[in-house]
Amino acid sequence: DNLFDGAGIRVICNYRDDVYSVSNYLSSQSDIQVLRVKDYIKNPKQNGYRSLHVIYAVPVFLSSGAHYTPVEVQFRTIAMDYWASLEHALRYKTDLPDAKLSEHSQTLLDCARSLQNVEAQMQNIHRDINGAPQVGEAPKAG
């Protein structure tokens, strides 16, 4: 992908429903436009990476008036975040031999699947306790 955003931020949420709620809340702001959405929660990357990436056009107010700049926001759960941090360290900050790197990559993929199942179970318990409705759609670009 080409560099598209001028700034970035990561929002860490407790539950997957919160990821979609917060992203939709931000997307509903009248002065913010959704430019692009990549939902790696519903469509994880091959390595197991899950996160919701939304690029917004956000107003920056200067003396000459409001100018819109692209800002990427990565929304993810706590579990998605610690998984991604470890995968990033394995991928970019290690000198492990290829065999060990491959072994750990497979283990991380297995962990990603396990975490997805655990998160779904925890989300269901949370919904039952709080009577919260299911929220599961990313904002729409355009």
What is the predicted function of each stretch?
Residues 12-124:
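Long beta-strand-rich cores associated with HINT superfamily self-processing modules
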Residues 1-8:
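A glycine-rich, hydrophobic loop/mini-helix early in the fold
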Residues 118-142:
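Intrinsically disordered, low-complexity acidic/polar and Pro/Ser/Thr-rich regulatory regions
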